[in-house]
């Protein structure tokens, strides 16, 4: 795993979502369009509101990246619904040394999400796509047609991707909540 001091250092340089999008206003429109189409259900909002352990979530991204456009706003929606989630963003190429530690399938893919405890101990690393995203891409790309990188994905696929990301946030929250180390620290 990545040393907590490294994660803490990169996190300190990372940006909140809106500031990250402002780094390239010419590309922010695609992100905003996905954000406008994305809504959490009442059940999802309730689950996220119940989180009690603080988690630092660092997204290594590329504002130019189609997968980041399709998934990044979903991550932002999840974080908006829970005061326990501190979500920050870094550009893969700006933080190249850190990103090199997070290769997926041998490449510098994005988005990659680093989930860390309140003290920056790494709990999980996820990326670059959820299972629902891979299934959707396979349906569209493995055959006679090919998807355009910026094309809107079907609403049911987007909802499934949102739920899978939410599941990962929930999994990490339970990991943090049940951690003997953190339970001892918080006396619960």
PLM region spans:
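Conserved redox-active cysteine motifs that mediate thiol-disulfide chemistry
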Residues: 63-70
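General small-molecule cofactor/ligand-binding pocket signal
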Residues: 88-90
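Non-globular targeting/processing and membrane-anchoring segments
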Residues: 1-56, 76-86, 99-109, 123-188
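Short glycine-rich or small-residue beta-strand-to-loop segments that form or flank ligand, phosphate
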Residues: 56-62
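Structural microenvironment flanking redox-active thiols in thiol-disulfide oxidoreductases
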Residues: 92-98
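Residues immediately flanking
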Residues: 62, 92, 118
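Acidic, Ser/Thr-rich peripheral helices and adjacent loops at domain boundaries
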Residues: 108-118
């Amino acid at each position: 795993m990545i040393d907590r001091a490294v994660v803490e250092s990169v996190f300190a340089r990372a940006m909140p979502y809106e500031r990250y999008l402002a780094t390239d206003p010419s590309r922010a429109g695609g992100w905003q369009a996905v954000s406008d189409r994305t809504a959490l259900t009442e059940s999802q909002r309730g689950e996220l509101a119940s989180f009690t352990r603080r988690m630092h979530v660092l997204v290594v991204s590329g504002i130019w990246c189609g997968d980041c456009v399709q998934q990044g706003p979903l991550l932002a929606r999840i974080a908006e619904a829970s005061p326990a989630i501190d979500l920050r963003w870094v550009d893969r190429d700006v933080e190249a040394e850190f990103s090199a530690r997070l290769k997926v399938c041998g490449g510098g893919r994005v988005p990659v999400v680093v989930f860390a405890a309140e003290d920056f101990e790494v709990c999980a690393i996820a990326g670059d796509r959820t299972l629902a995203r891979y299934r959707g891409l396979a349906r569209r790309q493995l055959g006679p047609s090919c998807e355009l990188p910026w094309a809107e994905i079907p609403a049911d696929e987007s909802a499934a991707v949102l739920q899978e990301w939410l599941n990962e946030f929930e999994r990490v929250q339970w990991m943090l909540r049940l951690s003997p180390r953190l339970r001892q620290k918080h006396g619960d």
